[in-house]
Swiss-Prot record:
TM ranges: none
Protein name, UniProt field: Large ribosomal subunit protein uL18
HAMAP family registered for this protein in UniProt: Ribosomal_uL18_B
Any single biological process term in GO: translation
Functional summary from the UniProt entry: This is one of the proteins that bind and probably mediate the attachment of the 5S RNA into the large ribosomal subunit, where it forms part of the central protuberance.
Family: Belongs to the universal ribosomal protein uL18 family.
A GO cellular component annotation in the UniProt record: cytosolic large ribosomal subunit
Signal sequence, start to end: none
Lineage: superkingdom: Bacteria
Organism: Lactobacillus gasseri (strain ATCC 33323 / DSM 20243 / BCRC 14619 / CIP 102991 / JCM 1131 / KCTC 3163 / NCIMB 11718 / NCTC 13722 / AM63)
Length: 119
């Protein structure tokens, strides 16, 4: 019997393929996105040193739990861009972690761009 492909396995395969090609530095960190059913998380990572420079998620107290998931994702993107601006980070490499550039991932990216991050 032909089995249906596991979406998360395929996403992880795409993520590994993408991660082999992109890497973040202190000057241009990697903006990594993780999307769960309930929340969305984003962080700026310096892969050379192996440290997280900034992060934001829907679990943060300053991000409203009201509104749709798309609106919450946009708030996360805005909060991350503001945190990056305080740390003088203007340019990033976008890592969508194997997710399609659509919906919440796109909303987060667009909000980050509108608030000053370049990618």
């Amino acid at each position: 019997m032909i089995s249906k492909p596991d979406k998360n396995k395929l996403r992880l395969k795409r993520h590994k393929r993408i991660r082999g090609k992109i890497s973040g530095t202190a000057e241009r960190p990697r903006l990594s996105v993780f999307r769960s059913n309930k929340n969305i998380y984003a962080q700026l990572i310096d892969d050379v040193e192996g440290v997280t420079l900034a992060s934001a998620s829907t679990n943060d107290k300053n991000i409203s739990a009201e509104g749709s998931k798309m609106e919450q994702a946009a708030e996360v993107g805005k909060a991350l861009a503001e945190t990056a601006a305080k740390k003088n980070i203007k340019s990033v490499v976008f890592d969508r972690s194997g997710y399609l550039y659509h919906g919440r991932v796109q909303a987060l990216a667009d909000a980050a761009r509108e608030n000053g991050l370049e990618f």
